[in-house]
Amino acid sequence: MVKIAIFASGSGSNFENIVEHVESGKLENIEVTALYTDHQNAFCIDRAKKHDIPVYINEPKQFGSKAAYEQHLVTLLNEDKVEWIILAGYMRLIGPDLLASFEGKILNIHPSLLPKYKGIDAIGQAYHSGDTITGSTVHYVDSGMDTGEIIEQRQCDIRPDDSKEQLEEKVKKLEYELYPSVIAKIVK
């Protein structure tokens, strides 16, 4: 059994999708040890409780520095014998302490065809760009924002009559297929 921790900051829909794939047996030999969140009111907490997944709520402002925050996370991760970190809507850059402790073992999913539209509101950026395609990317995490080595991408059309909300749903659907597929191939 490979132990993974999932980090999320918001609604946690990708978190829940991964958990459901584990529970159904579609993702084999994986144990989700806990949800790590940096927001005490994040909806992902409710999703974790629904699936009886332990939750660690650690707000960076509780710590004197980013290094202290990350060292605390590393301690918790090591106590749970976590082997991989899966970012699922975690809205913080990963710093040197986590990167050093989990080198090559942190994955992220981003709602664009990287290297295009890094950072926040990637779907909105694609929607307003005039592009005719967008998609989702799973990549290894490095010290930059959405700059790690790309593992796999899936794409969808941006139709002239799509609303931003419709495009968000298309990309979310891609993510729900792509992330578990990549996790199954990579996390061993």
Swiss-Prot record:
One Pfam family linked to the record: Formyl_trans_N
GO biological process, one term: 'de novo' IMP biosynthetic process
Binding site for (6R)-10-formyltetrahydrofolate: K66, M91, R92, L93, I94, N108
Keywords: Purine biosynthesis, Transferase
Pathway: Purine metabolism; IMP biosynthesis via de novo pathway; N(2)-formyl-N(1)-(5-phospho-D-ribosyl)glycinamide from N(1)-(5-phospho-D-ribosyl)glycinamide (10-formyl THF route): step 1/1
Keyword Transferase attached: yes
Entry keyword Nucleotide-binding: no
Binding, N(1)-(5-phospho-beta-D-ribosyl)glycinamide: G12, S13, N14
Task of the protein: Catalyzes the transfer of a formyl group from 10-formyltetrahydrofolate to 5-phospho-ribosyl-glycinamide (GAR), producing 5-phospho-ribosyl-N-formylglycinamide (FGAR) and tetrahydrofolate.
Record-stated family: Belongs to the GART family.
UniProt protein name: Phosphoribosylglycinamide formyltransferase
Biological source species: Staphylococcus aureus (strain MRSA252)
Gene, per the UniProt record: purN
